[in-house]
């Protein structure tokens, strides 16, 4: 399985200055639940946005073009083929692609599961989720969580690629 995991506002926004444009603890718990025990692939900038690195209890894989980049406690790779080679060596762990936008683009043709959190509000930011062909996927679950701040009301959706 290769899954995309991300949160977006109602306009598809996913980032602001290298960080999330909102603070949503419930979604951070969801992110953790979806990545613990798995291979989590992120780009260098996304990795560096984490307050504590590497994220515990999961394999942190950093995909970067910087040949000399080092990330203590993480696996650093320089192309998509290296990610799949690493995953093949660890068949017991699912592959979760967690951004940013360039990393999603690199894996766009390989994804079979979409784990998206949709926030009801509209936020300020500078990075949107890449376009996906939603017709290639079927929604298999959806759960809405109300928030006292209507903009933070959010829905967790799981989509599977059609056979």
Swiss-Prot record:
Keywords for this protein: Antibiotic resistance, Methotrexate resistance, NADP, One-carbon metabolism, Oxidoreductase
InterPro entries linked: DHFR, DHFR-like_dom_sf, DHFR_CS, DHFR_dom
Gene3D superfamilies, A to Z: Dihydrofolate Reductase, subunit A (3.40.430.10)
GO biological process: dihydrofolate metabolic process; folic acid metabolic process; one-carbon metabolic process; response to antibiotic; response to methotrexate; tetrahydrofolate biosynthetic process
Ligand binding (methotrexate): 27, 32, 58
Residues of the DHFR domain: 2-161
Catalytic activity of the protein: (6S)-5,6,7,8-tetrahydrofolate + NADP(+) = 7,8-dihydrofolate + NADPH + H(+)
Tagged with keyword Oxidoreductase: yes
Residues annotated as binding substrate: 5-7, 27, 32, 58, 117
Pfam families on file: DHFR_1 (PF00186)
Enzyme class of the recorded protein, top EC level: oxidoreductase
Superkingdom in the source lineage: Bacteria
Oxidoreductase among keywords: yes
Pathway: Cofactor biosynthesis; tetrahydrofolate biosynthesis; 5,6,7,8-tetrahydrofolate from 7,8-dihydrofolate: step 1/1
Site (May be important for enzyme function): 22
EC code(s) of this entry: 1.5.1.3
One GO MF term: dihydrofolate reductase activity
Residue sites binding NADP(+) per the record: 6-7, 14-19, 43-46, 63-66, 80, 98-103
Function: Key enzyme in folate metabolism. Catalyzes an essential reaction for de novo glycine and purine synthesis, and for DNA precursor synthesis.
Misc. comment: This bacterial strain is resistant to the folic acid analog methotrexate (amethopterin).
Family classification: Belongs to the dihydrofolate reductase family.
Subunit structure: Monomer.
PANTHER family: DIHYDROFOLATE REDUCTASE
Protein name listed in UniProt: Dihydrofolate reductase
Native species: Lacticaseibacillus casei
Gene behind the chain: folA
């Amino acid at each position: 399985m290769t899954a995309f995991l991300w949160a977006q506002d109602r306009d598809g926004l996913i980032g602001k200055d290298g960080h999330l444009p909102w603070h949503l603890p419930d979604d951070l718990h969801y992110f953790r639940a979806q990545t613990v025990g798995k291979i989590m692939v992120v780009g260098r900038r996304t990795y560096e946005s984490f307050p504590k690195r590497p994220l515990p209890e999961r394999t942190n894989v950093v995909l970067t073009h910087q040949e000399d980049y080092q990330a203590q406690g993480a696996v650093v790779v320089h192309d998509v083929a290296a990610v799949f080679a690493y995953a093949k060596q660890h068949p017991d762990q699912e592959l979760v692609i967690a951004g940013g936008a360039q990393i999603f683009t690199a894996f766009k043709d390989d994804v079979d599961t979409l784990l998206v959190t949709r926030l009801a509000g509209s936020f300020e930011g500078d990075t949107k989720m890449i376009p996906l062909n939603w017709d290639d996927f079927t929604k298999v679950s959806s759960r809405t969580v109300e928030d006292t701040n209507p903009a933070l009301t959010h829905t967790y959706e799981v989509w599977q690629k059609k056979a």
